[in-house]
Amino acid sequence: MFAVIETGGKQYLVKKGSVIKVEKLEAEEGKEVEIDKAVCLSGNGLSYLTDATVKAEVLEQCRGEKIIIFKKKRRKNYRRKTGHRQYITVLRINEINLQK
């Protein structure tokens, strides 16, 4: 069984036992979170399923890879180099439920 969930403005295809990296969630490591925005469950449709939930365990709160931002204006000796690291949460999917 698989599900498509939405969190942090992005959609993820998940199965039981899969590990995903999502935008930062307010949860401590080792705690369980419940995601109720299931877009699709085993191909049942493309609308939000109000009775479907996905339970996941928070494995880690960390930061992603660094993204380099480089701005330049030619012939003007203008160069700016900055970087950014986004906070992410690593989840392990434990359970996919569909209450009927």
UniProtKB/Swiss-Prot annotation:
Please name the GO terms of the biological process aspect recorded for this protein, alphabetically. translation
The protein's UniProt keywords, in alphabetical order, are: Ribonucleoprotein, Ribosomal protein, RNA-binding, rRNA-binding
What is this protein's name?
Large ribosomal subunit protein bL21
User: Which protein family is it in?
Assistant: Belongs to the bacterial ribosomal protein bL21 family.
Gene Ontology cellular component list: cytoplasm; ribonucleoprotein complex; ribosome
Kindly list the cysteine pairs connected by disulfide bridges. none
Can you tell which superkingdom this protein's organism belongs to?
Answer: Bacteria
Q: What is the lineage of its organism?
A: Bacteria, Pseudomonadati, Pseudomonadota, Alphaproteobacteria, Rickettsiales
> What organism does the UniProt record list as the source?
Wolbachia sp. subsp. Brugia malayi (strain TRS)
Subunit (UniProt)? Part of the 50S ribosomal subunit. Contacts protein L20.
